[in-house]
Amino acid sequence: MRFFFLLLPVLLASMVSFAQENPYFVTYDHHMEEPGNLDLEVSATTDVPRAGQKYYFAPWMEFEYGVTARWTTELYIEGQTTYGDSTVFTGWRLENRFRPMKREHWINPVLYLEYENLNEASRIQKEIVGGGSDVTSPNSELRNTSAHELETKLILSSDFHDWNVAENFIVEKNLSKGEGFEFGYAAGFYHQLATLASGEKCRLCRENFLAGVEFYGGLGSTLNFSGRNTGNYVAPVVSWLVSDNATLRFSPGFGLTHESSPVLFRFGYSYEIQGIGSSLSQLFGRKR
Amino acid sequence: MRRRSTFVACSLLVALVTMLGQNPEYRQDPKWSAPDDAARKVNPLATRPGATAGGKKLFLRNCAECHGNGSGIEKKHSADFLLPVVQDQSDGTIFWKITNGNTDRGMPSFSKLPEMERWQLVLYLRTLKPVPSPR
């Protein structure tokens, strides 16, 4: 086992991959993680609070692994710090995405299933359903209310003339208490700034940038189905292939309703490691 | 005489390394074939050889992980681009295979790359020299 930990940094350094992540923070498209690759990502959500609310910073970490070319699984760990209040661990999520169709089509569906073990202090707002997060109550109160939730999404995504267009329909059920089924949506589009790769190795070339816009928000629940009294945002998104193995993403989200924060800022850094699945299985004796 | 035998030994070694570096066991998936209209597509960059360098960069980013870096060393089940069974396919067929992938065999779709970048990949693949299959 000691041998494994000694070898791990060498293994990681030698397996750098070069794939660029899409720029969305909330919307999913139909592109899955490549089989055997592990994508490590650190991201955060913060906002400009309304009067009477407190500034918060909510980081999360993702471990995204391509099990097969049509199945991606992902583990999230998240927390948050509220200025003048406290720092708390807010829980974890395990998601799976399945792509039922083998080939590319005009519209490509993906089925999404996630289990969430969170408390009510969660602020990352990876998706917004129902009426959105409670950003007014103190952490000491919110962290004691745990929520076991099951979330499903229907992801529809198309690549059309070098544009990606994606729509997500979200249904979430809190298994811990009777809130009915909560609904939400996300949609977006993006484009690579240059569509022909230059022969030179460059970092600030347009080909290394993806830019677009996403829209997301809650749609109420079965108890109160409505777009009113929910958070809704429009958010420009941009990603930059900052080095051969890493992507930086940034998105300012602008609230469209009174229940939304005036501005949400999201940023993320992802680092992809290729072939980690097969390398680890070889390390433990499986033949290639 | 000695120089000649050294030359022959070196040539045999190079041939052996090339053959061993290839993936002669690679067999096309018979179910993985491009529709006729896709197979007939012509590479719009065929008259722009300057785009090949960008294709090489994209190849190293996206393909070399499984298919090797063009020297014929790759994962067991991945296509070896040096083999005639790959090089004999039309540009349109290779473009279609890059776009759609073969998800049952672990080849992901690369439709996330802009169309011109996928044609750049085809352009670069054509510069790889095919080696006859060992009988």
Regions found by a protein language model. Give the residues of each.
Chain A
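Bacterial N-terminal signal peptides
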Residues: 5-14
